[in-house]
Every structure is written in structure tokens, then in C-alpha cells.
Amino acid sequence: MHLVFLLMKFQMKLNESIRYASILVIDESGNPLGVFTSEQGRQLAAKKGLDLLLINPNADPPVCKIVNYGKYKFELEKKAKAKRKNQSQLKEIQMSYNMEEHDYQVRLSQACKFLKAGDKVKVTLMLKGREMQHLELAQNKMAQFQADVSSLAQLAKPPSQEGRNLSAIFVPKKS
């Protein structure tokens, strides 16, 4: 949301801040009205009770549109919010290969919740101290986890060792 405000603050010129000798004016429905001076463009917008917004300052002549600025700003925010909403996030779940069954079930239910919400899940099995000697037990735990979430997810990145951790990434299955 802050990005939209920054863009509007620094790039969008409105009404009196538009100072060009001539501008191409477009009405609220997108039809070009013609080339006018900045003052004439502001007067056209004022007659309709709307604002004159600079759309493209790099064009020759610069392009301005007659809009209801409050509504226009709201639409931009709505589009930005919808774009953010559709992005999936990477959630991480950390486990140990020798954890108790209840703890494992809690992590499994968290992963299922994330996957149902459409997020990617990174499962990390942490190995401490001498546990590095029992890497096959950690791989077995990861295989068990993969089997348990196979109805909801598919493996995006197979289990790989990263230092003292064994991690894999799961993505939700397409319905």
C-alpha cells in the first residue's frame, strides 16, 4: 500500500501542478478531447467537477486525463491490494528427526493449513551436534512428512542438505 502512495506522491501531478504549454486531454471514458493549454484543461475538468491528472509526461504533447481523483486513487489501491493478495508466500516449518509424535502432528497440521491457504512450505529438519551422524534418520522423517502431505502438495525442491539442516520445499497441488 505504501508503494502506491509513494508512486502517487512523486509521479502523479494534479490540477495546478500541471504546467505545460499544451496537453492532450482525455475524458473520463477514455476518449481524446484534443490538445489544449494546461489552463483550458483545468477549466474543462472543473466544469465537470473532476480533476485533471497527468498520465504520461513523456509524450508529445503530455497526456492528461479528466478523473475523479479520489475514486482513481481508490482503484489503484484496490489493484495493488489484489496483486499482493494473489502472491503466495514461503512458510517455514522447523523440525527435528527425533521429535515426539504429537509435536510432529502439530507441525504437519501447520503445514497442511499453509498448503490449503495456497502458500509454499519449506520443511527444515535441524540436526544438532552428533545428530549429523544419523542423517538417514532425518531423511526417513522427511520421507514420512512427504508421504503425509502427498494428498495436498507436491515436492518443488527435493530434500537437500544445507549445512546442518535438511530441507525441502512443497507447493500446493493444482486442483
UniProtKB/Swiss-Prot annotation:
| SUPFAM superfamilies attached to this UniProt entry | Translation initiation factor IF3, C-terminal domain, Translation initiation factor IF3, N-terminal domain
One GO CC term, this protein: chloroplast
Q: What is its main location?
A: plastid
Q: Where is the protein localized?
A: Plastid, Chloroplast
Homology family: Belongs to the IF-3 family.
Kindly state the subunit structure of this protein.
Answer: Monomer.
Q: What is this protein called?
A: Translation initiation factor IF-3, chloroplastic
| Organism field | Cyanidioschyzon merolae (strain NIES-3377 / 10D)
